[in-house]
Amino acid sequence: MKSGQADLFAQASGDSDLLIKPMNQLQIQDWPPRLEGLSETWLEILNDFWRSPDGLSLDQKMKAQLATGQVIYPRTPYRALTLTPFDQVRVLILGQDPYHGAGQAEGLAFSVGMGQKIPPSLRNIFKEVQRDTGAMSPEGPSAGSLERWASQGVLLLNTALTVADASPASHSDWGWEVLTDNIIKAIAQRSRPCAFLLWGAHAQTKASLIEIANQAARPHLILKSNHPSPLSASRPPVPFLGCGHFGRVNQWLKAAKQNPVDW
């Protein structure tokens, strides 16, 4: 094991063969995820989902996979909801599914755990933040964690909340999207306006969901661009690099007499 990687792994208690497992791996004893620390509205949405046919089906799939020893990330699927209570959501940044490597996913879209190398998409996000707002890219072992955004009311939501190791989008059709669609609709329907940042074709499919849910014509801000991935960040029709979303969000917040986000 390379120097600096030891903190990303932990010995699985009770394993006779002393398997070493990533710290961010979802364990069978962690399922179903704990609900402590979640706001009342998040609890209502989650409980309604897990009682539904889609939720029951997803629960069975997760239990079956964990029972076979399938490596699944992250250990904390609800972390975005825990860090950003429903009534504090000011901005929603929509991702697709968690990073699928050991130590990476930490339950926040685009964010990576302590000591992890910053992925290319997140590197482009920081690059655009600096270009748009002048904020310097973070440094140090926690540089890739976006927890500081989440604590300011930025909900970093993936449309699927788990993924199998080394298998991108492996849980994208398991039913998570029913839950996350309900979360998006609940935010669009509440009285407090929200800025929705939709990067890439997958995220932009949710624009109509937001508009349909927003029957009261609340003054939400919906911003679209290409995905920050190097494959699309500089391409038309709306390159991510140069989109100016971070500055526009702060202008919108200031106009609504709210504090800007410290990106």
Model region roles, listed by residue range:
Residues 6-9, 218, 258-263:
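C-terminal catalytic domain of photolyase/cryptochrome flavoproteins
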Residues 9-12, 27-33:
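Short, Lys/Arg-rich amphipathic segments at extreme N-termini
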Residues 1-15:
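Short linear clamp-binding motif
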Residues 22, 26, 36-210, 214-216, ...:
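A polyanion-binding, active-site-adjacent surface
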